[in-house]
Regions:
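Helix-rich catalytic cores of soluble enzyme domains
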Residues: 100-194
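Acidic/polar, glycine-rich intrinsically disordered N-terminal extensions of enzymes
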Residues: 1-105
């Protein structure tokens, strides 16, 4: 009953309120699929039939590969998988108090995450390394994650460049024939204010 209420509320948001989509190609894709699109406002409203048709195309289950096959993560059929939070900006220590995260902090959290058996994934950005320019962070994070953990990896899909770089690195690790196309998307501001 609670799941159904959540589903219905989600459908109402997608149909009645809609989402901001700030990419022309994304607007094209949704419009071609039959969604209501306002290009001037960069806004899309998704009919529940369209949403459910897309959801029906998703596989019922899949395996998220890890560098160590013993750490592959099965997704689906009521399997539970835990991942760490991502995008944390600050670290706190007894010695230095609260401060912006660094690449060294990221490496330390990655090592800690690797040792936690109850966490199945290595997070995409366990801590934001503020000592690295934002445009380069993914290029510093992912190689370190590949080197410091053999768990299944996640990387941010914040735009085409980051996603393409992550897929390229994944193919170097898993082989050219791999299809590393899984990403968790979240939108903290679906109605962004102007």
């Amino acid at each position: 009953d609670q799941i159904e209420k959540l589903h219905q509320a989600s459908m109402r948001i997608l149909e009645d309120i809609g989402l901001a989509m700030m990419d022309g190609e994304t607007l094209d894709i949704w419009q071609k699929a039959g969604a209501k699109v306002d290009r001037a406002r960069q806004h899309v409203w998704l009919d529940r039939g369209l949403v459910m048709e897309a959801v029906a195309k998703a596989p019922a289950s899949f395996t998220w590969r890890a560098r160590n096959p013993e750490r592959d993560v099965f997704i689906g059929e009521n399997a539970i998988a835990f991942a760490p939070q991502g995008g944390v900006a600050y670290v706190t220590s007894l010695d230095q108090g609260r401060q912006r995260g660094t690449l060294a902090d990221y490496e330390n959290f990655l090592k800690l995450n690797h040792m936690l058996g109850v966490i199945h994934f290595a997070g995409e950005q366990l801590i934001a390394p503020h000592d690295v320019p934002a445009s380069l962070r993914h290029l510093r994070r992912l190689p370190r994650a590949i080197a410091l953990t053999d768990k299944a990896l996640q990387e941010a899909a914040h735009g085409r460049e980051i996603t393409a770089d992550a897929i390229h690195l994944a193919r170097l690790v898993f082989g050219e024939s791999s299809d590393p196309s899984t990403s968790v998307q979240r939108d903290s501001r679906p109605m962004r204010s102007r």
